[in-house]
A protein has these predicted regions:
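Hydrophobic residues in well-ordered beta-strands that form the structural core
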Residues: 50-51, 81, 203
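Structured C-terminal cap/extension of enzyme domains
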Residues: 39, 47, 66, 189-374
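Short catalytic-loop micro-motif centered on adjacent basic/acidic residues
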Residues: 48-55, 145-149, 172, 248-250, ...
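Short beta->alpha linker loops
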Residues: 55, 59, 152-153, 254, ...
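Conserved residues at the C-terminal ends of beta-strands
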Residues: 14, 52-55, 113-116, 150, ...
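Glycine/proline-rich, positively charged
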Residues: 21-22, 29, 39, 86-204, ...
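N-terminal binding-site loop/beta-alpha segment at the start of enzyme catalytic domains
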Residues: 1-77, 134, 140
Length: 374
């Protein structure tokens, strides 16, 4: 890990869920509250701010300029932003994102530049557009200090990407205590792969999009019994803070109270006691036990599906609904995670069920998913 990475505070400020003046308008960022949030974060020792070309429909970067860049010296903070090449209609437009981001941010360079959400068919778009070489060239020209990528795929995909692109300075991964040994996310294995390549990790989704803060009551009670004074959020963040090879842990903060709480929890961070670790293990076991579809993500069902239904993804989302008891949240995830092959396109041919080693009634489960999420 680079020396400057060693001194990066472990709490990072994610600028994807900023406070809004109008909840129905993602562009209506509450700048005055955002300024207070930035001040509180920096006063608490934070320096890392994470944004992206598309956050808040393109206004997050400009808001960060107003709340941070225009008000603090350049050596008081670091900024990460991202390129979504797979959403661009041409290589030229994808490459122009960086210049636009720099203009919006009011910066001559960004400290961290990510090729965002690499994986699956999206990787081919980054390759075809020459984005890997473009990002490295931007680093050579001083427009970018560090180049990396974010991804949601498993460990084998990460291994392939880091082997193909050994020049990466960092990688951004979904890591949290619920996904640590998840057979789809493979957070533990991904962390091991990154460490083996000597690439530090920026952690995203440490609280699973807020779901580890809104736990089912019986799960929350297990954690509170072990430490009545600890917030549910602090359990999620402490798990990530104390992992090796972590550059920083992002929190998408939406109001001043969240910043204050996260800063306080960060400043009080310590490793879990044996009792706390047992409580977390019990909480995870309970959450896992609430997942009733025994899918292991073997993916035997996918290859011959004539409709291209993303069956393991959909079954995983059904399990997530059971674990979190929050259908609205999972429905939001479904809208993009299942977009390549939604449940309603199933024609009930039964090919998948014939291939499933777990004997899952897949056709029925897809009907349930379509009813719940579409």
């Amino acid at each position: 890990m680079k020396p400057e990475f060693e001194t990066t505070p472990k709490l990072g400020f994610g600028c994807m869920r900023l406070p809004l003046l109008d909840p129905a308008d993602q562009k209506s960022i509450d700048i005055e509250q955002f300024k207070q949030m930035v001040d509180t974060f920096i006063e608490g020792g934070g320096t890392y701010f994470d944004t992206a070309f598309v956050y808040h429909e393109g206004t997050s970067e400009r808001a960060l300029k107003e709340a941070l860049v225009d008000r603090y010296p350049r050596d008081a903070y670091t900024v990460a932003t991202k390129c979504l090449a797979w959403a661009a209609p041409s290589a030229e437009e994808a490459k122009s994102n960086l210049a636009t981001s720099l203009e919006r941010l009011g910066l001559d360079y960004v400290d961290f530049y990510l090729l965002h959400n690499v994986g699956g068919e999206r990787t081919a778009k980054f390759d075809a557009y020459g984005m890997w070489d473009f990002a490295l060239d931007a680093k050579e020209r001083g427009l970018v200090k560090n180049v990396g990528f974010s991804m949601h795929d498993g460990a084998d995909a990460l291994e392939a990407l880091l082997t193909a692109h050994p020049q990466m300075d960092f990688v951004q991964l979904q890591v949290n205590y619920l996904d640590w040994d998840d057979p789809v996310v493979e957070a533990r294995r991904c962390m091991e792969v990154a460490a083996a390549h000597g690439v530090p990790v920026v952690v995203m989704e440490p609280a699973r999009g807020g779901r580890l803060v809104e736990l089912p009551q019986r799960v929350a009670d297990v954690l509170r019994e072990a430490n009545p004074d600890a917030s549910l959020a602090s359990w999620a963040y402490r798990f990530c803070y104390n992992l090796p090879n972590v550059l920083t842990v992002l929190s998408g903060m939406s109001n001043l109270d969240q910043v204050r709480q996260n800063v306080a929890d960060y400043q009080a961070n310590r490793p879990f006691s044996p009792e706390e670790q047992r409580a977390m293990d019990a909480a995870v076991e309970t959450l896992r036990g609430m997942a009733s579809v025994p899918c292991t993500n073997c993916r035997y069902c996918v290859k011959d599906c004539p409709q291209g239904v993303v069956i393991p993804t959909i079954l995983g989302l059904l399990n997530l609904e059971l674990m979190t008891e929050n259908r609205a949240f999972v429905k939001g995830l479904y809208s993009w995670q299942a977009a390549p092959g939604p449940a309603s396109t199933c024609i009930a041919c039964g090919t998948c069920e014939a291939m499933c080693p777990q004997g899952i009634d897949i056709v029925h489960q897809l009907e349930v998913a379509a009813e719940h999420f579409e």
